[in-house]
């Protein structure tokens, strides 16, 4: 075949793309472009036609030129020549033209005709009217109920469409088009049509007189600015394929829009060979046609053609010759996406700026999978690319997913630079932006949670006893110890004096699986209480308070309310108040209908009544056994394994049941509570020890109360072995020793008493089952005589013939006692590292003991504060990444921050760790984090529970619950609601990121967007992965807030946890007061902006779900503001709002400017960081603070340190720069004859490193006015005083000599004078009575390390600038 010659008419980016694709055809040898462009001329097969050879308006001349030059095909890019009839003239000359006839082009050039055509041929479109009379058009508008779009009927370069917001705008548009003739003759007729709602998609197809071959759908972006704001343009970018249109909808467009159009044109004898472009709106009623275009779209063409896996010339010829029917469905690159971002010149679309030099085009063109198409470029006499139009060029990127392609294309625009360039950073966002996510859609139902709280409050209230203060729903449960009395050994009512608090935590293990299978939940709560209360009892303590933790996949309010009712029943039986709890809905960790429970009990006893009295236990003491009610709550993994292996069903009638109950109902018999019969018995002082027979059975639990040299000998003949145990032994072939090590075997509690004491006989069903003996050297501490024989006899009853079953052990069922013991050994050092005064004993006993009188604070009227929480689905990230060392900090922070909100000092902490298979290393890492959290909050890790529950958790999954106890004086308890008043200030404490709430929503977002935890987080300040950023631990506020609590001026604290700012602040307010916050004073972390953008999360939903940058708020009187802030120096806390009256029916939280500030942070995500240079002369402590801040995502610095310059060699500041991999240099002022010469050298070096902002961090040189003026508004300095006080180098000394009670530091813009520039930020530092210059200086340094990063952030982000009057101006 002879090589084909083509003529391409047009000069823009669309034509560049067409030429680029056509030259890839093996059939094409030459492409003539007219008028073309220099960009198009760079293509190998292209040559430009000289303007002297042709006139674009002279179609006969063009046809003649084609004949002379043997042109095989003419491709017409723009619509104007088609509308004027170029195709007709060429076809008349027997020249193939890819483009419709003049009559066919009318489908675009005459919108009134086009709308009528759609109606005639039943093409789905909007209702409309066409007018030449403005009055009639406006009358139609005023009488139409729908929102409207006003269009100039003719060609208006893509700008003649006005989407009216209201009737007035629509009428004004009519006046502009018909009255002012804004679009010339294109506006002789105006079309007014119904405004359709939905996503707009471009669908193009090759067509001839019969057939359609569809191209992949694309989406154009018409508005100038991000988020579809700004003026209408010809198109600022596009992407393809567009996933917003379904295959079903695309089929409708092909058949009911494009094919009907082709059929209609044929029926009306209109020639149409070319591209038919349909602008489609995806409405609720299906796809509707907005408009037709008669040519390739711009910029859609530029992103569709790189995906086309066909010969474009062949397709065009098939269209021109009516042979499309012979072309199979088109092929495109598989799993490839294309995104194009248009770069426009300054002033576009109203004007264009020409002649600006463009750099970076060649750099982008050399990148893999990048293409640059020129729309409006030229070259100057230096052979440099320059701007030559409104839309200058389009950067195309191809990638295997749309987000990546969009990111690459946008970053390419950062490489290509020219003065005044405009481009959008959100091209393609609509495709991967999911619908507006809510917390409820992620599986967490806040309303259900609130409903549950309402239902269980009465249950909780029914358990209250003396000492209880407040009710469920606050930040902790409160008990007033002075109100708790007991009957002493003399029978007198007495207050506790030397108080020891005994705390225990436990769960109910895989007994939950039985409850789940049977769907019977009313007694499992009793088990939970019994497991904790009985342990506390073993230390001689009276149980007084209880907390529960309930985790589930889906909160079914009736089920959880039933569980809590059981908990309340247990608490009433134990005279132990249910004063709080946590219900954690975690859809990505638990399946629907799946639950886990953990409980915590605190008891109270006198120091000299603590049990066990190990030193008082002697040979001959008697062992009393209290019968169990059945299996209780241990060993159920073995029970479940036996059922799994034998095939019995829980719903079958149990062979061992005397009351014909099913196996499930027998197994669900609740654990026996021993408080009521045992507690009075403890008061006589004869009891030496108690042992609760739980996990580990008789063999493991009794030794916990014995000295090493003694043992217990008990006789199985002294009590009746319940049938359930022999049945289990028989069907699981479990040996006697395994039974004794796994189950209670009928004895739920052991009491050790003196030999001659017979008071135990008053306890119902109590049995003397043995005595204390001398232990054989290294022999067992528990000897159970006759048990093997008793068990064998009972087992025989259940055996069927000679059938033997496989022997099953507890380890076989998935529970490894050895691993559990290894873990205890591993974590003991971690727990010990947290010890503080008051701790008694260590890990491994039945409860954790704490002596209040030794804690370091003397309490007159102590209040106990109890709190519980978990870490939620943040755990899932840790588990997927195998990073377990920080979630323990989260656990402690979530609990101890709540304790703090009551004005209390956290003292002790207990953890609950539940897993499917115990990995000792993982659990050790988790507990090491818990210990670190305890150290950060000065609380002690007093104990915990590790529950290995095969079948309830997958092997690599675990859940955590924490229980914290704090103490405060009664008069210091917060919130002081009665003291709150209008005008009080609200102080905000910055968060450390997301903390530990809202992660179910984050998981849902990741599920929908396809992000991975190992991907680099776009919002990260230091290139960390999503996983690393989201695992940043929750901030512990104890140490920074404690000094403020000691002032006595704090009225309330609110921990911003689940429910966000919206729901947590009202928890500390009376109904008549409202918190008014100012978002301009909150440093909103970039992570929240990223979540908002990518999850399309409504701003109110953000406030209801996340902390949004504030992890704790404090309320105090305005008059005490200075004292409070002085006590908080070094904490980054600041005033963010005030208390105002509540409006009728108003919410109790108002966040002013929230949407505006959030959107600003969202925009900052896509803006390159400001490049910062730091000038130093010394150790560089402020440099280090700036380095640390710019590497912290949560600081949101919008800047990076790219260069450090020193005027002195060998200083420590340079080492800091080197360690941070920041380039540095030394320019000594001694090497220059004048200050001016030195400053010129500084300036040149800073420019060389593209520095945009300079920070003077201890730079001991006075800069010249010339240098300062060059960097005006970009030069920051820090000074160690509250300017304008005490300028110069003796500021600290001056402050002390003046007798001031506060000093501080100031960050300011630098001007020509010393320390006189406009102030940006100040931090207050208190001056103490015995302060010296050195001590004050040291404290000011701490404040500087907060103030300088804060000021840099404000300037780099554009929140603060220096105006023309040299004053600080806030955005």
UniProtKB/Swiss-Prot annotation:
Residues binding Mg(2+), per UniProt: 291, 293
Q: Which residues form a coiled coil?
A: none
Q: Name one GO molecular function term.
A: metal ion binding
The protein's Enzyme Commission number? 6.3.4.13, 6.3.3.1, 2.1.2.2
The keyword Manganese appears for this protein: yes
NCBIfam families per record: purD (TIGR00877), purM (TIGR00878), PurN (TIGR00639)
UniProt lists the gene as GART
The organism named in the record is Chironomus tentans (Midge)
Q: Which InterPro entries match?
A: ATP-grasp (IPR011761), ATP_grasp_subdomain_1 (IPR013815), Formyl_transf_N (IPR002376), Formyl_transf_N_sf (IPR036477), GART (IPR004607), GART_AS (IPR001555), PreATP-grasp_dom_sf (IPR016185), PRibGlycinamid_synth_ATP-grasp (IPR020561)
Q: Cross-referenced Pfam families, in alphabetical order?
A: AIRS, AIRS_C, Formyl_trans_N, GARS_A, GARS_C, GARS_N
Site-annotated residues for Raises pKa of active site His = 1315
Source organism phylogeny? Eukaryota, Metazoa, Ecdysozoa, Arthropoda, Hexapoda
What's the protein here called? Trifunctional purine biosynthetic protein adenosine-3
Q: Where is this region: AIRS domain?
A: 434-1171
- Quaternary structure (record): Homodimer.
Tell me the function of this protein: Trifunctional enzyme that catalyzes three distinct reactions as part of the 'de novo' inosine monophosphate biosynthetic pathway.
């Amino acid at each position: 075949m002879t090589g084909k010659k083509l003529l391409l008419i047009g000069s823009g980016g669309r034509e560049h793309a067409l030429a680029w694709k056509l030259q890839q055809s093996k059939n094409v040898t030459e492409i003539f472009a007219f008028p073309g462009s220099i960009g198009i001329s760079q293509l190998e097969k292209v040559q430009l036609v000289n303007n002297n050879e042709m006139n674009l308006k002279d179609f006969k001349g063009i046809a003649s030129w084609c004949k002379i030059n043997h042109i095989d095909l003419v491709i017409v890019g723009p619509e104007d020549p088609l509308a004027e009839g170029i195709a007709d003239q060429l076809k008349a000359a027997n020249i193939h033209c890819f483009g419709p006839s003049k009559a066919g082009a009318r489908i675009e050039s005459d919108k009134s005709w086009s709308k009528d055509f759609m109606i005639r041929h039943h093409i789905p479109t909007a209702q409309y009217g066409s007018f030449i009379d403005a009055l009639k058009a406006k009358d139609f508008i005023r009488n139409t109920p729908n929102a409207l779009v006003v269009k100039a009927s003719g060609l208006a370069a893509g700008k003649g469409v006005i989407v009216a917001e209201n009737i007035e705008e629509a009428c004004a548009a009519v006046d502009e088009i018909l009255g002012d003739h804004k679009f010339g003759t294109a506006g002789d007729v105006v079309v007014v049509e119904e405004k359709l709602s939905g996503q707009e998609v471009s669908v193009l197809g090759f067509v001839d007189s019969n057939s359609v071959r569809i191209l992949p759908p694309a989406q154009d972006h018409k508005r100038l600015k991000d988020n579809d704001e700004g003026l209408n343009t010809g198109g600022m970018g596009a992407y393809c394929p567009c996933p917003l249109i379904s295959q079903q909808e695309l089929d409708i467009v092909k058949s009911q829009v494009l094919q009907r159009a082709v059929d209609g044109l044929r029926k009306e004898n209109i020639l149409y060979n070319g591209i038919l472009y349909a602008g489609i709106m995806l409405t609720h009623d299906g796809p509707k046609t907005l408009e037709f275009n008669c040519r390739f779209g711009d910029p859609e063409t530029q992103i569709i053609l790189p995906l086309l896996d066909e010969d474009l010339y062949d397709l065009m010829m098939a269209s021109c010759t009516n042979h499309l029917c012979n072309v199979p469905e088109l092929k495109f690159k598989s799993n490839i996406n294309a995104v194009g971002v248009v770069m426009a010149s300054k002033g576009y679309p109203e004007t264009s700026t020409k002649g600006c030099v463009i750099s970076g085009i060649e750099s982008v063109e050399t990148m893999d999978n990048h293409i640059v198409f020129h729309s409006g470029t030229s070259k100057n006499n230096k052979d440099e690319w320059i701007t030559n139009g409104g839309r200058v060029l389009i950067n195309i990127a191809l990638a295997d997913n749309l987000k990546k392609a969009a990111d690459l294309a946008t970053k390419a625009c950062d490489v290509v630079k020219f003065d005044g360039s405009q481009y959008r950073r959100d091209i393609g966002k609509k495709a991967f932006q999911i619908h507006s996510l809510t917390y409820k859609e992620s599986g967490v139902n806040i309303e259900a949670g609130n409903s549950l709280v309402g239902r269980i409050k009465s249950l909780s209230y029914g358990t209250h006893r003396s000492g209880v203060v407040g009710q469920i729903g606050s930040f902790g449960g409160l008990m007033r110890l002075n109100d708790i009395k007991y009957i002493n050994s003399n029978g007198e009512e007495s207050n506790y004096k030397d108080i020891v608090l005994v705390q225990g935590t436990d769960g109910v293990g895989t007994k939950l699986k039985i409850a789940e299978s049977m769907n019977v939940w009313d007694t499992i709560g009793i088990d939970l209480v019994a497991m904790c209360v009985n342990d506390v009892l073993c230390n001689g303590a009276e149980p007084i308070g209880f907390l529960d933790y309930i985790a589930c996949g889906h909160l079914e309010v009736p089920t959880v309310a039933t569980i809590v009712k059981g908990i309340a029943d247990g608490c009433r039986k134990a005279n132990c108040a249910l004063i709080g709890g946590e219900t954690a809905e975690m859809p990505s960790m638990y399946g629907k209908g799946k639950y886990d429970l953990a409980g915590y009990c605190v008891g109270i006893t006198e120091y000299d009544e603590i049990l066990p009295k190990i030193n008082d236990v002697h040979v001959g003491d008697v062992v009393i056994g209290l019968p169990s009610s059945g299996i209780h709550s241990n060993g159920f993994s073995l029970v479940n394994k036996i059922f799994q292996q034998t095939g019995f069903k829980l719903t079958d009638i149990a062979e061992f049941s005397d009351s014909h109950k099913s196996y499930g109902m027998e197994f669900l018999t609740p654990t026996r509570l021993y408080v009521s019969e045992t507690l009075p018995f403890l008061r006589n002082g004869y009891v030496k020890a108690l042992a609760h027979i739980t996990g580990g059975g008789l063999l493991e639990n009794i030794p916990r109360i014995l000295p090493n040299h003694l043992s217990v000998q008990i006789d199985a003949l002294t009590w009746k072995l319940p049938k359930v145990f022999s049945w289990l032994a028989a069907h699981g072939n479990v040996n006697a020793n395994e039974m004794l090590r796994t189950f209670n075997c009928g004895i739920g509690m052991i009491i050790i008493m003196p030999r001659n004491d017979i008071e135990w006989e008053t306890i119902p069903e109590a049995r003397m089952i043995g005595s204390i003996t001398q232990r054989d050297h290294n022999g067992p501490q528990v000897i159970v005589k006759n048990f093997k024989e008793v068990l064998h006899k009972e087992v025989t009853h259940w055996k069927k013939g000679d059938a033997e079953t496989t022997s099953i052990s507890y380890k076989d069922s998935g529970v490894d006692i050895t691993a559990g013991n290894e873990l205890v050994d591993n974590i003991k050092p971690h727990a010990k590292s947290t010890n503080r005064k008051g701790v008694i004993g260590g890990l491994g006993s039945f409860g954790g003991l704490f002596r209040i009188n030794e804690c370091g604070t003397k309490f007159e009227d102590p209040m106990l504060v109890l709190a519980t929480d978990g870490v939620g689905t943040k755990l899932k990230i840790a588990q997927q990444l195998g990073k377990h060392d920080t979630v323990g900090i989260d656990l402690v922070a979530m609990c101890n921050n709540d304790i703090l909100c009551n004005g209390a000092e956290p003292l002790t902490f207990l953890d609950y760790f539940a897993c499917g298979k115990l990995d000792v290393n993982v659990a050790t890492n988790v507990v090491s984090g818990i210990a670190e959290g305890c150290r950060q909050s000065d609380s002690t890790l007093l104990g915990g529970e590790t529950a290995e529950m095969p079948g309830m958790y997958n092997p690599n999954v675990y859940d955590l619950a924490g229980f914290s106890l704090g103490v405060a004086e009664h008069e210091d308890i917060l919130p002081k609601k009665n003291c709150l008043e209008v005008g009080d200030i609200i102080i905000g404490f910055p968060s450390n990121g997301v903390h530990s709430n809202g992660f179910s929503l984050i998981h849902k977002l990741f599920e929908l967007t396809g992000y991975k935890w190992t991907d680099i987080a776009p919002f990260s300040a230091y290139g960390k992965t999503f996983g690393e950023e989201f695992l940043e631990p929750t901030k512990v506020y104890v140490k920074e807030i404690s000094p403020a609590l000691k002032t006595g001026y704090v009225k309330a604290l609110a921990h911003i946890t689940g429910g966000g700012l919206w729901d947590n602040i009202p928890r500390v307010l009376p109904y008549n007061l409202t918190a008014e916050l100012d978002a301009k004073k909150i440093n909103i972390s970039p992570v929240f902006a990223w979540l908002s953008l990518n999850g399309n999360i409504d701003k109110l939903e953000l406030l209801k779900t996340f902390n949004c940058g504030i992890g704790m708020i404090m309320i105090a009187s305005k008059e005490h503001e200075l004292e409070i802030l002085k006590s908080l120096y070094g904490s980054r806390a600041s005033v963010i709002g005030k208390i105002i009256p509540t409006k009728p029916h108003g919410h109790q939280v108002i966040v002013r400017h929230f949407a505006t500030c959030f959107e600003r942070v969202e925009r900052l995500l896509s803006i390159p960081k400001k490049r910062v240079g730091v000038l130093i002369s010394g150790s560089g402590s402020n440099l280090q603070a700036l380095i640390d801040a710019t590497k912290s995502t949560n600081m949101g610095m919008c800047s990076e340190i790219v260069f450090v310059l020193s005027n002195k060699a060998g200083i420590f500041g340079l080492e800091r720069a080197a360690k941070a991999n920041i380039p540095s240099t030394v320019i000594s002022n001694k090497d220059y004859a004048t200050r001016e010469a030195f400053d010129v050298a500084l300036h040149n070096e800073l420019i060389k490193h593209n520095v945009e902002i300079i920070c003077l961090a201890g730079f001991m040189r006075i800069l010249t006015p010339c240098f300062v003026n060059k960097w005006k508004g970009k030069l920051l300095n820090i000074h160690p005083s509250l300017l304008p006080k005490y300028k110069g180098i003796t500021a600290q000394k001056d402050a002390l000599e003046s007798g001031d009670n506060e000093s501080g530091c100031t960050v300011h813009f630098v001007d020509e004078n010393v320390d006189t520039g406009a102030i940006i930020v100040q931090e207050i530092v208190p001056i103490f009575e015995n302060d010296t210059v050195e001590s004050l200086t040291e404290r000011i340094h701490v404040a500087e390390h907060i103030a300088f990063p804060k000021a840099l952030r404000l300037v780099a982000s554009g929140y603060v600038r220096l105006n023309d009057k040299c004053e600080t101006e806030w955005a």
